[in-house]
Amino acid sequence: IGLYIAADPHTFDMVELAEQTPFAGSSLAGGLVLAAILIGLAVKTPTVPFHTWLPPAHTDAPAIGSAVLAGVLLKMGTYGFVRIAMPMLPEAWRDWAWVIIVVGIVSVVYGALVALAQTNVKRMVAYTSVNHMGYIVLAVGAAGLIADDTTQARSIAVTGAVTQMVSHGLITGALFLLAGVLQDRAATYDMDSYGGLAGPAPRFAAFFAVGAFASLGLPGLSGFIAEFQIFTGSIAAAPVTAIALVGILLTAALFLRALQRKQLRET
């Protein structure tokens, strides 16, 4: 509504709003409008501290519902950052860039740490969504810091964010469907209830391993391509974003642990 009122002529057309940048030169009003937009998009994405609805939603939803939620619905939040907030409020976005970067870093590390502590495979994958959405927020925040003379780094960061949206949707959607297979066959998501699945269910084990390796960013898979672009662009803008590299190590640890508990450990 704020963008509509400030636009001249009044419009909800996103292309026209991006061309007008209605709050150019008004840092206070632009900052308030951006803050409202960011809170709404942060809930939808979700990022820390607005993430608490996501794990219960995934845990209680059927596998297909979780796949659609992760693959499509969460992307409406991150799409909003790239399509609405950044182009329509560029000055305010630059002013808020460090806040956005910090939220992204916290989401990356926190999501991975909490996922590492889970025994429920579906909740584990749900918390990795917080982790992976954090990478996107980190990238778009870093893009706000990059000056016009480093447009290549800015482009790489934003391209990495968009690639991560697609990659996360495919990978995490697949992992939720595979978790649904476990629930369908054994009526539980508890990883400790399984063991040695690689023997009796080799195809399931192979599919889950591919999904896990893609999610942790193994080179050659889409997760690596997205994260490489994100960090290439982000670290050029703000070296502090390298802290988020810890999230990659934690994600590798949690998925390797899950593979060992479900597929290799003898019961």
Question: What do the predicted segments below correspond to?
Answer:
Residues S27-G40, I101-V102, T159-A174, A238-A252:
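Alpha-helical transmembrane segments
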Residues V48, T172-L178, T241-T267:
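Predominantly late transmembrane helices and immediately cytosolic-facing juxtamembrane segments
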Residues I1-G2, A63-Y79, S129-A142, A201-G211:
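Small-residue-rich segments of transmembrane alpha-helices in multi-pass membrane proteins
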Residues A61, D192, A198-F204, F255-T267:
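Cytoplasmic/organellar membrane-interface segments at the starts of transmembrane helices
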Residues A63, A67-V68, M124-V125, A157-A161:
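Alpha-helical transmembrane segments and their helix-entry boundary regions
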Residues I1-H51, P56, F81-V99, A142-T159, ...:
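Juxtamembrane/interfacial segments at transmembrane-helix boundaries in multi-pass membrane proteins
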Residues T45-T59, V109-T128, G180-Q183, L259:
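C-terminal ends of transmembrane helices
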Residues I37, V68, I101, V125-A126, ...:
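Hydrophobic/aromatic positions within or immediately flanking transmembrane alpha-helices
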